[in-house]
Structures are given as C-alpha cells and as structure tokens.
C-alpha cells in the first residue's frame, strides 16, 4: 500500500502534536500448564514464564524504537487465578499473586492481569477464594490487577459476589482499588486492565493491542469544522481508521518478533490526564459546552458508531471492549466537569448505555456506606446484562467527604469523590442470591 505525502505528514502530526500512541501492547498467555494441587509446583512452573516475558519486553521496545511510536504500557494477561485456587487454599493465592508481580517487575512489565474469577450464577471454591483474598493480593503487589465477572446476559447477575467485592475494595488503598474491577459480559481478549485475562478459546499465547488517540479525533473535528451530523460522523470515522491501522501495525510486528499469533485491536479511545488527550474534549469539540450537558449521550453515541465503523474498516481483528473509555480521573476535562457538577453518577449511567466503559475511576466516600456502592454497581451491571453489553465498575473508596480530590499521579490522575444519592437502600442491598437472566437470553435460542 502506498502512502501520499499528505498522509505521512498527517501521521507525523498525530504522533508529535496530538499525543497519538499505543496505550498498551498486551501479551495474553495460557498459564494453565502450571495447574497443580501442590503450591510449590505451581510457583516453579509459573517462573518458567520468565524467558517469554523477557522476549516480549524486548520485542515491544524494538518495535517502538524502529517505528518511532510510543508504547505507553506493556501488559501481560494470564489465565484466571480462580482455576488455580480450585485445588489450592487462599494462602496459595497470595503467593501466586506475589510471584506474578515479581515476574512483572523483573521484566519491566507495567501490569500483570488475571487475579480474576467468574461468579455469574454462583461461586465455586476457587472463585470464592479469589474474592476473599482480593484485597490482600492487590495490597501485597504493585503490578497485579484483578477482575470479578459477576454477571452475563446468558446467566444473570450474582448479587452475593457484588457484596463481597465491595467488602474487599473498602479494605484497599486507592492505589490498589484502582487495579480492581467488577464487570459483566467480560470479553476473553481485552488488552485493558483490570479486565484483561487469558480467556477460554484463546491460543497458547497471543498479542492484543489497545490504541489511544482522543487528541487526534478532537483535532480532526476542530480542523474540519463539519456543518452536518453526517460530516461530523465521517471526520471521526476517517480519523479512527488511521488510529486503528497504526495499532494493528505495532501489534503484528510485536507478534511477528515473538513468533506468536496477533490477536486483536481494541478500538477503545483511552484518554490520559495530559491536556489534549481527552474523550470529554471530543464531546465538547462536537458542540457541547461542558460534557454532561443535554446532548452528551447523543454526541457519545455518534462518536462510538463512527469509531467502530472506521476501526472495522482498518482491521478485521477487532476485540476487547472496543468503545470509548470515560475514566473520570484519567481524563483532565472529566475531572474538571466532575468537580463543577456537570458530571454525576446518573450522567455516567446514561453514557454507559452507548459505550462499554461503565463507571470507571470515580471516587466514592466510605462515609456514605457500602449499601449505596452495592446499589450503584448493581445498576451498571444490570444494564450490561439487559442490553447484552460489556460494562464494568471501578470505583475508589476513599475516607473523605464527597467533593474531595485525591491525586494518584501518572496515568491514574486525580480521583474525584462523587456524591452518591442520599437515599437509604439497605433493605434492597441485603438481598442474597442472584438475579436470573433476562428475556434477552431467549433471543439466543
């Protein structure tokens, strides 16, 4: 394929002026070869991953330097730890967590993801052990991330696991709870943490890629000054095509260097705290004075559809969440809007209906209690189950009044403690069991 001089200059501008980068190159690797009822054997087998992780780290660095494309993070996704804890005790889970964390540190891997369990309809021994060690595992590590898939359109929503999850994150520091999520309909090939894990049906090892690029789309809209909604859609679609093509190039080259298959490109637009790298900035460039104002959901829906259509044209290997992320703390403009009140939890719930982010990187006040957080999570995951969407919740419990701001630094940004509704929901949150799958399940046959 030949490139015009204009296209080359455009890519140069994207990389150097509009913060286009690869958010993550993720090695997803099967670790079930290490299964055993002997903790010592599991640890020793997991340590044999060292040579693969070394090669992965070197390959990403080489590809990044060769093409002049910044890769923000290197990540590794492993098989869910639930499977290991079916035959091992809770203490073994902590030791496995520490071993994976040490491997990540040794090879300069930013995150190792997979301290995870599936509890859609109920909990096996392994799943419950993961949940009950969740806080200790993440507090004992720096790079480990974890996910609880608490629901699916096929099986329903497990209320008990939501309550256990909330108990665990209330024990965590903000830095640890930022590495924990609860989700419904989780995909098996996500390159994004904390949801990343080596899912069922995947090959032995595979490379998945997450792109970034909100600044590219915002810049394209501002330059084009579209007059109609069709023109606006087209501008976003074309920019998305170019972003995705770059992501696939990097992913395929890393996979080629490692001698393993390339998996998928996650089309999600991931913001960062840097100025000019904001999903909220795109919505405001589309004509909403402050994101959260009426019309914001429509603007986000247009953005999502155009990004997916442009991305699908650029690659036949689409995977992960493939949506727009609206993590409040990781988006500088979202932080401002949350502080001034134009963004609240109901705004985020409405936006979740048209994207796959859910409620992400938002602070909640421990002083408002667990019951309200349980209800909030149930609201988001119920939408996922009912609409057959991927949605998750990553909230940061903080011992402060609503309105407080805690700076976690780096990509995690500033966490705004947003006010939960002052309505008593303790009776509802005291229910046990699971919510049966909806009528949507019947449409699947």
Where in this protein do the model-derived segments appear?
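Anaerobic metallocofactor- and corrinoid-dependent redox/one-carbon enzyme cores
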Residues: 1-445
């Amino acid at each position: 394929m030949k490139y015009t001089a204009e296209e080359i200059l455009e890519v140069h501008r994207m990389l150097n002026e509009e913060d286009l980068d690869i958010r993550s190159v993720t090695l997803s690797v099967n670790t079930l070869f290490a299964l055993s009822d002997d903790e010592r054997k599991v640890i020793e087998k997991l340590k044999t991953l060292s040579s693969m992780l070394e090669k992965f780290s070197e390959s990403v660095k080489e590809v990044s330097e060769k093409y002049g494309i910044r890769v923000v993070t290197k990540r590794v996704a492993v098989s869910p730890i639930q499977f290991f804890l079916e035959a091992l005790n809770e203490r073994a889970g902590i030791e496995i967590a520490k071993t994976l964390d040490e491997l990540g540190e040794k090879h300069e891997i930013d995150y190792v993801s997979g301290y995870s369990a599936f509890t859609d309809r109920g909990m096996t021994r392994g799943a419950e052990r993961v949940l009950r060690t969740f806080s200790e595992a993440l507090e004992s590590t720096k790079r480990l991330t974890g996910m609880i898939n608490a629901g699916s359109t096929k099986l329903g929503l497990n209320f008990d696991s939501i309550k256990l999850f909330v108990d665990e994150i209330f024990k965590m520091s903000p830095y640890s709870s930022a590495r924990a999520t609860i989700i419904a309909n989780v995909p098996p090939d996500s390159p994004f943490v904390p949801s990343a894990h080596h899912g069922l049906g995947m090959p032995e090892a595979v490379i998945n890629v997450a792109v970034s690029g909100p600044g590219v789309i915002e810049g394209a809209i501002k330059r084009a000054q579209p007059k109609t909604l069709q023109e606006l859609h087209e501008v976003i679609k074309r920019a998305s095509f170019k972003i995705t093509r770059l992501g696939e190039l990097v992913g395929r080259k890393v996979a080629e260097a490692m001698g393993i298959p390339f998996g998928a490109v996650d089309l999600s637009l991931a913001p960062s705290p840097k100025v000019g790298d904001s999903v909220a900035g795109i919505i405001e460039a589309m004509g909403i004075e402050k994101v959260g104002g009426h019309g914001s959901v429509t603007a986000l829906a247009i953005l999502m559809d155009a990004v997916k259509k442009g991305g699908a044209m650029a690659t036949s290997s689409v995977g992960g969440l493939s949506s727009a992320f609206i993590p409040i703390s990781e988006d500088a403009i979202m932080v401002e809007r949350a502080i001034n009140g134009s963004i609240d939890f109901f705004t985020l719930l409405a936006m979740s209906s048209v994207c796959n982010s859910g409620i992400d990187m938002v602070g909640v006040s421990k002083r408002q209690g667990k019951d309200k957080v349980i209800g909030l999570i149930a609201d988001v995951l119920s939408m996922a189950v009912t609409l057959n969407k991927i949605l998750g919740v990553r909230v940061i419990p903080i011992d402060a009044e609503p309105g407080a701001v805690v700076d976690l630094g780096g990509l995690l940004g500033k966490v705004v403690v947003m006010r939960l509704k002052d309505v008593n929901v303790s009776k509802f949150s005291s229910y046990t069991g699971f919510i049966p799958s909806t009528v949507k399940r019947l449409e699947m046959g």
